[in-house]
Swiss-Prot record:
The keyword DNA damage does not apply. InterPro entries: CAT-like_dom_sf (IPR023213), Plant_acyltransferase (IPR050898). Pfam families: Transferase. Its EC number is 2.3.1.-. This is Alcohol acyl transferase 1 allele GSc. One of its GO terms (biological process) is alcohol metabolic process. One of its GO terms (molecular function) is acyltransferase activity. Signal peptide: none annotated. Expressed at very low levels in the skin of ripe fruit. The fruit of cv. Royal Gala exhibits a high ester accumulation, whereas the cv. Granny Smith contains low ester levels; this influences strongly the ripe apple fruit aroma. The gene is AAT1-GSC.
Length: 456
């Protein structure tokens, strides 16, 4: 594995990639879900590909993907534009053809040498995704930045991008990446045509809040535990792996009526919420929350949106508890609260969020240390994006974002599992890791039984 100091990346001057054809010059409003304060940040994504001569016929991946990007922008032309604010800070896109920022780079390294440094929290993110001056803002800046780094000694490449989250959620970004990939493989148009129609998620006039939204409520007199005395320099990131063994041990800690009805995501979320709260040493009487980002698309949540809709279409309903019962009760207590919160998500809930954002002047989610937000990216589909070199060896968010953790699919040795990056103050991180190791440790008698069953 390569030491961090050894990697040297050579970058060419950034270029603006514009749509391959003329596109409409117009102004487009974002939806009230897109427009919330919570989404005014840029999210980094990394996609790593091995060389595959049998598929790519020795083509130059930078040239192929850059040209495909330009052609895909004919359909996704708002992504090549810039945001501005209107009255009451309402976001809108000025469709004036400025382009996406594209950086070509190279490094004398192999993907094998990089090893787990490609995984979140990616310690080489600044090398894979250069923060070009003037590109990191929300207003008047490129909505997408792409850096392609070719790994000269192995023929593979790393595509890293940074997306202004007000424009797309994970499902919307996947539609865009899939369109680029299809065109890189020779398609003349995306198989799913993009749909803007952000007015579908505008609040009605007059807006009316019909659901409880704990995720936007402020907690009076919160303490934050060890979060309160921490600054950004004291925050550390670390990833935690949940494989078959960890899930087997956790499932033995929940009551039978929950074993068959809870998902892996539910169980991991309950576990993180409980033991993160313990690690932060939060006041026992304080309310603590965890929000699960829930996609509104699909039959389950019954939100009627076109197939090609690529705007933000999710909510993050919050489970809430006092810290003391959360920490003292068995894991099933947290699990039931997580399941109950997720079950509130439907079309009425999403539209009630839009109404709340308009009525209350676009409130920020609670940003205290007693709050955790989790997003399941294991089924987002980033691992299926094929530009002509096969599927990526890794694809997904590059790191956690303060209070937000992304769950990503990861193969550890021979098994598929879930990797969860977490951001915490350094002292709390040590306690959190110790707690996780303790509660996912398999009892000795179970280890012996598993060895006997394996040898039979």
């Amino acid at each position: 594995m390569m030491p961090l100091a050894v990697l040297q990346v050579k970058r060419l001057q950034p270029k603006l990639i514009t749509p391959a054809k003329l596109t409409p010059q117009e102004t487009k409003f974002l939806s009230d879900i897109d427009d919330q304060e919570f989404l005014r940040f840029q999210v980094p994504i990394i996609m790593c590909y091995k060389d595959n001569p049998s598929l790519n016929k020795n083509l130059n991946p930078v040239k192929v993907i850059r040209e495909a990007l330009s052609r895909a922008l004919v359909y996704y032309y708002p992504l090549a534009r810039r945001l501005r604010e209107g009255p009451n800070r309402k976001l809108m896109v000025d469709c004036n053809g400025e382009g996406i920022l594209f950086i070509e780079a190279s490094a004398d390294v192999t993907l094998e040498q990089l090893g787990d440094k490609m995984l979140p929290p990616c310690p080489l993110l600044e090398e894979f995704l250069f923060n070009f001056p003037g590109s990191g803002g929300i207003i008047g800046c490129p909505l997408v930045l792409v850096q392609m780094m070719t790994c000269l000694t192995c023929g593979g490449f790393i595509l890293a991008l940074r997306l202004n989250h007000t424009m797309c959620d994970a499902a919307g970004l996947l539609l865009f990446l899939t369109a680029i990939a299809e065109m890189a493989r020779g398609a003349h148009a995306p198989s799913i045509l993009p749909v803007w129609e952000r007015e579908l998620l505008f609040a009605p006039d007059p807006p009316r809040i019909t659901c409880a939204h704990h995720e936007y409520e402020d907690v009076i007199g919160h303490s934050d535990g060890s979060y309160a005395s921490s600054n950004q320099s004291n925050m550390v990131q670390r990833s935690f792996y949940f494989g078959a063994k960890e899930m087997r041990v956790l499932r033995k800690q929940i009551p039978p009526h929950l074993t068959s009805t809870c998902s892996t995501f539910d169980l991991i979320t309950a576990c993180l919420w409980k033991y993160r709260t313990l690690a932060l040493n939060i006041n026992p009487k304080e309310a603590v929350r965890v929000s699960c980002i829930v996609n509104a698309r699909g039959k389950h949540n019954n939100v009627r949106l076109p197939l090609g809709y690529y705007g933000n279409a999710f909510a993050f309903p919050a489970a809430i508890s006092k810290a003391e019962p959360l920490c003292k009760n068995p894991l099933g207590y947290a699990l039931e609260l997580v399941k109950k919160a997720k079950a509130t998500m439907n079309e009425e809930y999403l539209r009630s969020v839009a109404d709340l954002l308009v009525l209350r002047g676009r409130p920020q989610y609670s940003s205290t240390g007693s709050y955790l937000i989790v997003s399941d990216n294991t089924r987002a589909g980033f691992g299926d994006v094929n530009f002509g070199w096969g599927q990526p060896v890794f694809a997904g968010p590059a790191k956690a974002l303060d209070l937000i953790s992304f769950y990503v699919q990861h193969k550890n040795n021979t098994e598929d599992g879930i990797l969860v990056p977490m951001c915490l103050p350094s002292s709390a991180m040590e306690r959190f890791q110790q707690e996780l190791e303790r509660i996912t440790r398999e009892p000795k008698e179970d280890i012996c039984n598993n060895l006997r069953s394996t040898s039979q």
